[in-house]
């Protein structure tokens, strides 16, 4: 049986997606034929995606402002059932039931949506808006199906596109391996790794990644990347301010009194004390990220990012906590500021005995990142903010929810304030956010000290806020002493936690955040953008399922994305020829500029030494870096200053390394192992072939490209080299030696009678300014 679409397009029942139909099967068994399938498909792809998820769910859900109404939906992102089928089936039934209700022979659903009947959300849809038309079409279709008239008035057809990755080339396995080893371990692939991948393809990648993820460089990158997300290094007043004066006043400044009498010279002693303090502060800043590294390194469930009942301490930070004497025997080297071990803090003791921390266990109630002092200092509170910043960041970091996107901004704040005594608890446009945000803010109520971290509000918690809890569950009074642990336990059971951690891994690998569902239905590219979002979302959820099955081992998520076509997509030129696919594929493929840290590591991996200038924090900010405080977003698109830095880097690195490489024995060279400086283009056919082979090697080492010796790219580089040498030979008075500034350190200026060293230096400069080097 065939249905006619809106424009006469035939749609067979077999073409209607089986997984979606299963997920939204009607509870009403009277309508299970093809007509009902059309209603299902239209509901999922149109009504739910465009209306329900965007306009209804924020209030009509457990814990939402309309949770006591008869129209209560379930959030699919919190549904752990296969394909989120349980929630989608529930929502379809709820919509269908509401669509059949009438008031004065008009649809109750449409009247409420436009604010013509009593509706707490007022007019969420404007009459004749795109979303209203979708909902009206659905109501008409449901009533027609109920009356057996659907075939006379068919629902619009939902267009099918080509397979999402049709026309997309995947990255060569060698290039994929190079990308992964540079990204995760700051090195080029080893010969045995390349051989394994060449032999077994993607099957070998898991084993290779197992080795990569045991390297120290991987954990350095992991900490750096998660700081981009948590920004935990960016709090004010010095690192030691995380240890509150009220609880650690006698120990947090231990470096000022540390015995350095063995250093006789006063200036040297003062310098040593400065270094001691700097190392101590750096050790404190690293603590939250060392927790993350410890979890991953030891294959612990990544749920410990919020449930760990310990923090990480080094010999230096242990002194700050006043715990060094009891821990010193557990350290391998008590003078190493960056050796960390897991430690449980005793409950906090205040200078005022009445304000000691209450703890039934006798320990500080650790809850992973949620309770570490540095995280709490990074996201402080005020008398007016009332921990709402902390609640907002909790949702963003651990559940992937941007609370500010739950509802539109209040249109007339003065009018709302005048109308309601407590707008955040009474005004619908305020409640939609605050009923989610404020209960979590209340969870943090005992962490209210502005200058420190722990300390309940002296006047008790606010009465004009929704009570402490999480998503409709109230915090039991007996759990208040461990409220953050209670929150953590609820967090890791929420399917959004696993999905969010997988999204973080995507950001770490690609430098981009996952796609959000498009909102503007009148955007001509809406369908293409939605298809791109759905494809990426499906992949994210599939990797999240593997992540959960692997007991939340973060390495599983990394491997999942590494093998994903979203990470491996390479040449999209063919697909981009279709304008409709241009919007669909706009975010596909890796094309983000390397961060300052990544660029320095890439230079070091290829040339054996870093450039060095981007290690300066202020200079790095000019190249898109962050300080985790004022500058918190990395600039991914190069501007004028960044372009100038790229040119300077290319010139400096080539100058420092080309003559140096030629000065080494051929077997030890990175750049020019099979060519000497006495060989110039145009001298012989054999010589030109050797030069082209040297260029192929350079392209592989510097750019990660495996170009054929006869390729256009190799010809372009060859012509550049030949042109420079030809131009030099046509000039008079040029020196026959390399520049003084580019000579190897401690050596004489190397002879360069044919200008080949300088020409090769120009070639390397050219390659270092290529997109393949500067971008990932």
Model feature map: region roles:
Residues 5-232, 241, 319, 464-515, ...:
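Aromatic- and Gly/Pro-enriched helix-to-coil junctions and flexible linker segments
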Residues 1-2:
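Gram-negative bacterial Sec-dependent N-terminal signal peptides
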Residues 22, 136, 148-159, 168-181, ...:
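His/Asp/Glu-rich metal/cofactor-coordinating catalytic motifs and the adjacent surface-exposed loops
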Residues 514-516, 520-524:
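Substrate-binding clefts and substrate-entry loops adjacent to catalytic sites
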């Amino acid at each position: 049986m065939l249905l006619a679409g809106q424009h006469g397009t035939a749609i067979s029942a077999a073409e209607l997606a089986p997984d979606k139909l299963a997920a939204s099967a009607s509870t009403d068994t009277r309508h299970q034929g093809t007509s009902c399938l059309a209603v299902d498909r239209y509901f999922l792809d149109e009504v739910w995606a465009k209306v329900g998820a965007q306009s209804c769910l924020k209030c009509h859900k457990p814990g939402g402002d309309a949770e006591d109404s008869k129209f209560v939906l379930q959030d699919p992102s919190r549904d752990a059932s296969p394909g989120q089928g349980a929630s989608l089936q529930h929502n379809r039934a709820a919509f269908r039931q509401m669509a059949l209700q009438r008031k004065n022979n008009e649809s109750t659903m449409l009247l409420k949506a436009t604010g013509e009947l009593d509706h707490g959300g007022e007019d969420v849809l404007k009459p004749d808006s795109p979303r209203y038309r979708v909902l009206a079409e659905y109501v008409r279709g449901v009533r027609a199906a109920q009356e057996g008239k659907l075939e006379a008035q068919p629902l619009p057809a939902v267009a099918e596109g080509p397979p999402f990755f049709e026309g997309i080339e995947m990255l060569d396995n060698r290039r994929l391996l190079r990308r992964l080893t540079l990204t995760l371990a700051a090195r080029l692939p080893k010969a045995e790794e390349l051989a394994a991948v060449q032999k077994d393809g993607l099957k070998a990648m898991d084993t290779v990644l197992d080795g990569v993820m045991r390297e120290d460089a991987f954990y350095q990158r992991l900490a750096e990347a998660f700081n981009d997300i948590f920004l935990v290094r960016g709090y004010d007043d010095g690192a030691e301010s995380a240890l509150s004066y009220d609880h650690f006043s006698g120990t947090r400044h231990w470096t000022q009194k540390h015995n350095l009498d063995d250093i006789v010279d006063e200036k040297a002693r003062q310098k040593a004390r400065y270094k001691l303090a700097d190392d101590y502060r750096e050790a404190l800043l690293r603590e939250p990220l060392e927790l993350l590294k410890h979890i991953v390194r030891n294959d612990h469930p990544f749920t410990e990012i919020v449930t760990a009942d310990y923090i990480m301490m080094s010999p230096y930070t242990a002194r700050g906590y006043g715990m060094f004497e009891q821990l010193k025997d557990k350290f391998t080297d008590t003078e190493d500021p960056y050796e960390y071990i897991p430690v449980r803090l005793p409950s906090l003791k205040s200078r005022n005995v009445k304000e000691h921390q209450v703890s039934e266990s006798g320990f500080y109630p650790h809850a992973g990142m949620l309770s570490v002092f540095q995280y709490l200092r990074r996201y402080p509170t005020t008398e007016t903010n009332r921990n709402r910043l902390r609640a907002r960041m909790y949702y963003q970091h651990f559940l992937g929810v941007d609370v500010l996107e739950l509802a539109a901004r209040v249109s007339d704040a003065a009018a709302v304030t005048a109308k309601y005594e407590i707008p955040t608890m009474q005004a619908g446009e305020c409640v939609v956010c605050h009923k989610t945000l404020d209960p979590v803010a209340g969870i943090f109520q005992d962490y209210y000290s502005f200058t420190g971290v722990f300390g309940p509000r002296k006047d008790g918690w606010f009465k004009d806020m929704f009570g402490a809890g999480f998503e409709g569950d109230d915090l039991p009074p007996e759990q208040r002493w461990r409220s953050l642990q209670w929150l953590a336990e609820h967090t890791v059971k929420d399917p959004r936690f696993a999905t969010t951690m997988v999204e973080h891994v995507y950001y770490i690998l690609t430098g981009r955040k996952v796609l959000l569902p498009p909102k503007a239905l009148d955007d001509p590219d809406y369908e293409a953008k939605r298809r791109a979002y759905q494809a990426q979302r499906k992949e994210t959820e599939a990797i999240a399922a593997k992540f959960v099955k692997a007991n939340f081992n973060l390495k599983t998520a990394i491997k999942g994305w590494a093998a994903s076509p979203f990470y491996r997509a390479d040449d999209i030129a063919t697909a981009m020829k279709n304008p409709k696919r241009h919007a669909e594929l706009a975010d596909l493929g890796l094309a983000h500029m390397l961060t300052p840290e990544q660029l320095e590591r890439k230079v070091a991996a290829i040339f054996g030494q870093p450039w060095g200038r981007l290690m300066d924090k202020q200079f790095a900010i000019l190249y898109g870096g962050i300080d985790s405080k004022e500058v918190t977003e990395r600039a991914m698109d190069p501007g004028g200053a960044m372009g100038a830095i790229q040119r300077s880097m290319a010139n400096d690195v080539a100058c420092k390394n080309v003559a140096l490489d030629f000065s080494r024995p051929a077997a030890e060279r990175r750049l020019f192992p099979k060519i000497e400086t006495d060989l110039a283009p145009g001298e012989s056919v054999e010589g030109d072939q050797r030069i082209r082979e040297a260029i192929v090697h350079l392209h592989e080492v510097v750019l990660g490209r495996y170009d054929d010796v006869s390729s256009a790219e190799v010809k372009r580089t060859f012509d550049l080299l030949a042109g420079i040498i030809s131009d030099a030979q046509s000039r008079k008075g040029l020196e026959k030696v390399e520049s003084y500034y580019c000579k190897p350190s401690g050596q004489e200026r190397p002879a360069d009678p044919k200008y080949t060293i300088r020409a090769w230096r120009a070639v390397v400069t050219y390659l270092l300014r290529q997109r393949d080097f500067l971008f990932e």
